[in-house]
C-alpha cells in the first residue's frame, strides 16, 4: 500500500514540476518579442474557387431516393 502511495506522490510531483516549467505560461521579458516575431506570418491565400458561392444553398438537404418497386420485397410505403 505504501508503494502505491509513494509512486502516486512521485508521479504527481514530477508532473507538477514539468507543467510549471514548460510552455507559454512561463513569463519571460522577451516573450513579447517572440510574440511579435510569431505574428509576422504571411496570411494564406484562399483558393478563389472555394471562396465563392458554395455549391448548395444553405437549407439544402439530400433527399432519400425512393426504392425501386421492381424487386420483390415488403411494400416500401
From Swiss-Prot:
Signal peptide segment: 1-22
Site feature: Important for the balance between G(i) and beta-arrestin pathways induced by apelin-APLNR system: 75, 77
Observed phenotype of the null mutant: Morpholino knockdown of the protein show impaired gastrulation and heart formation. Embryos display reduced migration of anterior lateral plate mesoderm (LPM) cells and cardiac progenitor cells (angioblasts) toward the midline during late gastrulation. Embryos show altered cardiac gene expression. Embryos with CRISPR-induced apelin and apela null mutations show a strong decrease in the angioblast migration to the embryonic midline during late gastrulation.
UniProt feature coiled coil, ranges: none
A GO biological-process term: mesodermal cell migration
GO cellular component terms, semicolon-separated: extracellular space
UniProt subcellular location: Secreted; Secreted, Extracellular space
Keyword Signal: yes
Alphabetized GO MF terms: apelin receptor binding; hormone activity; receptor ligand activity
Residue numbers spanned by region Disordered: 21-77
Predominant subcellular localization, coarse grouping: secreted
Biased composition (Basic residues): 59-71
Keywords: Angiogenesis, Developmental protein, Gastrulation, Hormone, Secreted, Signal
Function: Peptide hormone that functions as endogenous ligand for the G-protein-coupled apelin receptor (aplnra and/or aplnrb), that plays a role in cadiovascular homeostasis. Functions as a balanced agonist activating both G(i) protein pathway and beta-arrestin pathway of APLNR. Downstream G proteins activation, apelin can inhibit cAMP production and activate key intracellular effectors such as ERKs. On the other hand, APLNR activation induces beta-arrestin recruitment to the membrane leading to desensitization and internalization of the receptor.
Membership in a protein family: Belongs to the apelin family.
The protein's name: Apelin
Native source species: Danio rerio
